[in-house]
């Protein structure tokens, strides 16, 4: 067993290599943690935007239903007015034919 300077230098070299590998792994893990935190923030923002979009879609759906109902009633009123005008016109023609 040699315990001279060469053995100590080899041991120190291996220790330094191991320390360098540990430092590299630590740096990689820090980068990964930063990426995970950034991803979490982006997901949170995306979730907030999705909630806002859902609320907007729900409001649009309600407004569209009200508008559909409003124009359905307008259409019914126009039909009623058209039928009334037609009936009055027919009555006028009948009265004119009978009185002639």
Swiss-Prot record:
PTM comment: the record says: Ubiquitinated by RNF167 at Lys-66, Lys-68 and Lys-77, regulating the recycling endosome pathway.
> Which of the residues are on side Vesicular?
99-100
A GO term, aspect molecular function: syntaxin-1 binding
- SUPFAM superfamilies xref list: SNARE fusion complex
Annotated v-SNARE coiled-coil homology domain residues: 14-74
Positions of post-translational N-acetylserine modification: 2
* Keywords, comma-separated and alphabetical: Acetylation, Coiled coil, Endosome, Isopeptide bond, Membrane, Protein transport, Synapse, Synaptosome, Transmembrane, Transmembrane helix, Transport, Ubl conjugation
| Transmembrane portions of the chain | 78-98
**Annotated membrane topology:** Single-pass type IV membrane protein
Statement: the UniProt record of this protein carries the keyword Acetylation = yes
Q: Per the record, what ranges lie on the membrane's Cytoplasmic side?
A: 2-77
Q: Which GO terms describe its cellular component?
A: cell surface; clathrin-coated endocytic vesicle membrane; clathrin-coated vesicle; cytosol; early endosome membrane; intracellular membrane-bounded organelle; membrane; neuron projection
The protein's matches in Pfam families, at most eight in alphabetical order, are given as:
Synaptobrevin
Q: Name one GO biological process term.
A: SNARE complex assembly
| Resulting phenotype, residue 77 to R | Abolished ubiquitination by RNF167
Quote the InterPro entries the UniProt record gives: Synaptobrevin-like (IPR001388), Synaptobrevin/VAMP (IPR016444), V_SNARE_CC (IPR042855)
Q: Does the keyword Cell wall biogenesis/degradation apply?
A: no
The site feature described as (Microbial infection) Cleavage is recorded at 41-43, 58-59
> Which compartments does it reside in?
Early endosome membrane; Recycling endosome membrane; Synapse, Synaptosome
User: Where is the crosslink of kind Glycyl lysine isopeptide (Lys-Gly) (interchain with G-Cter in ubiquitin)?
Assistant: 66, 68, 77
* Protein family per UniProt: Belongs to the synaptobrevin family.
- Stated role: SNARE involved in vesicular transport from the late endosomes to the trans-Golgi network.
Oligomeric state and interaction partners are given as:
Interacts with POPDC1 (via the C-terminus cytoplasmic tail). Interacts with BCAP31; involved in VAMP3 export from the endoplasmic reticulum. Interacts with BAIAP3; this interaction is increased in the presence of calcium. Interacts with PICALM.
Identify this protein by name: Vesicle-associated membrane protein 3
Taxonomic lineage from the root: Eukaryota, Metazoa, Chordata, Craniata, Vertebrata
